[in-house]
Structure formats: C-alpha cells, structure tokens
C-alpha cells in the first residue's frame, strides 16, 4: 500500500484521529492533496461496492408546519473512501465536504464514530 513512516497530515478537525495505516491515494485528506472544507456530517455507510466510493445515509426529522408534526426523512450522499480507513457497510462514519472528486462525489470519509 504505502511506505512505512509516511507523513500524515493533521486535517484540522477536532475529534478525528489520523489512521494508523498509510495509502497512496491522491484524494486522501491524510496522505494526499485533498483539503476538507465546509460542513461535517455523520451517517451510516450503506453501500461500499465500487472502488473507493460509497453511499452514506442520514436520517433526520423535518417539521411540517401545516400539520404541526415531524416526519422522518433521509438523504443519501455519495462519498469517497480512502483505502487507509478500515470501514465496512453498516458502520457509522464521519464525512466532510471537499472539492468535487467526481460528478456526484463531493464528500470524503474522515473517520468512524
């Protein structure tokens, strides 16, 4: 995968520890050139079949003013998964916004919860 003792960057987000493994991925926020910016979200990884790409699902409540009740909603976000992170389907992950990596991928996984 990567060289032993490779440089690990501090991405500047509190509560996120850098991974112990290294990787050669250019789009890794810890070992590559990808910078994280914008919002930080939490969700459940529901699909991890494509190479280095997955889908994170977030459940949230939406207030309907007409009926004065909350309804459950969910959103699915396409994410890039660096190979240095050990995540699998069903894990709760922390994702951060970054520049567009692909047509529909603008978030990257930065850790497990």
Curated annotation (Swiss-Prot):
A Pfam entry, by short name = Ribosomal_S17
Keyword rRNA-binding (UniProt) = yes
Arranged from A to Z, the UniProt key words for this protein are: Ribonucleoprotein, Ribosomal protein, RNA-binding, rRNA-binding
User: A single GO BP annotation from the record?
Assistant: translation
Please give the GO cellular component terms listed in this UniProt entry.
cytosolic small ribosomal subunit
Q: What does this protein do?
A: One of the primary rRNA binding proteins, it binds specifically to the 5'-end of 16S ribosomal RNA.
The cross-references to NCBIfam families, in alphabetical order and at most eight, read: PRK08572.1 (NF006345), uS17_arch (TIGR03630)
Q: Which protein family is named in the record?
A: Belongs to the universal ribosomal protein uS17 family.
- Oligomeric and partner information: Part of the 30S ribosomal subunit.
Name of this chain's protein? Small ribosomal subunit protein uS17
Q: Which organism is it from?
A: Sulfurisphaera tokodaii (strain DSM 16993 / JCM 10545 / NBRC 100140 / 7) (Sulfolobus tokodaii)
**What lineage does the source organism belong to?**
Archaea, Thermoproteota, Thermoprotei, Sulfolobales, Sulfolobaceae
């Amino acid at each position: 995968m990567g060289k032993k003792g490779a440089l690990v960057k501090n991405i500047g987000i509190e509560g996120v520890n850098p991974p112990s493994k290294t990787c050669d991925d250019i789009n890794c926020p810890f070992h590559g050139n990808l910078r994280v910016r914008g919002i930080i979200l939490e969700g459940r990884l529901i699909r991890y079949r494509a190479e280095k790409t997955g889908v994170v699902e977030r459940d949230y409540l939406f207030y309907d003013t007409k009926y004065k009740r909350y309804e459950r909603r969910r959103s699915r976000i396409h994410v890039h998964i660096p190979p240095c992170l050990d995540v699998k389907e069903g894990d709760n992950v922390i994702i951060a916004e970054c520049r567009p990596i692909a047509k529909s991928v603008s978030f990257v996984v930065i850790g497990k919860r």
